[in-house]
Amino acid sequence: MRKLLAAAFLISFPHAVLAQSPELEATCQTVVKNFFLTDKVAVGSVQSFPELKPPGVRMTYSTRQGVGPSDMTDTFECEFDRADKPHHLSRFCVANTCYSASEDDADRKRRFAEMRILLDRVEK
């Protein structure tokens, strides 16, 4: 029975790893860099969910270089219309503040539009 459980784990573990989407993660990192107006962002833990509707990415980050992944507590989340390119950004959140096209706050709505335009330029 133990061998069967171990075999099942080994077979299913690679599928869990493959569920991550490096392409979505890279796209979200582009949004982070554009949002903070920087070319370098240190990224800690990353989780991507291409199988969800909408597909998304959640990561810890630091705008300061030299920070270890365990010391990164700031979070950034991205949601996209699709898991394949062009992803088309549908929403992003910095900590507890979210930005989207349906946002009531005019500044957040404007900031979202800017990020979507910048991302669309890169993905064309």
Predicted segments with their positions:
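Positively charged n-region of N-terminal signal peptides that target proteins for export
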Residues: 1-4
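Cleavable N-terminal signal peptides
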Residues: 6-7, 17
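N-terminal signal peptide c-region/cleavage motif recognized by signal peptidases
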Residues: 12-16
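Short, non-transmembrane alpha-helical segments in secretory-pathway proteins
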Residues: 20-44
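Short, cysteine-centered beta-strand-loop-beta hairpins and adjacent loop/turn segments enriched
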Residues: 37-38, 62-75
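Short, hydrophobic/aromatic-rich segments at coil-to-beta transitions
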Residues: 52-62
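A short, surface-exposed beta-strand/turn
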Residues: 70-94
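C-terminal partner/receptor-binding element of secreted or periplasmic proteins
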Residues: 93-124
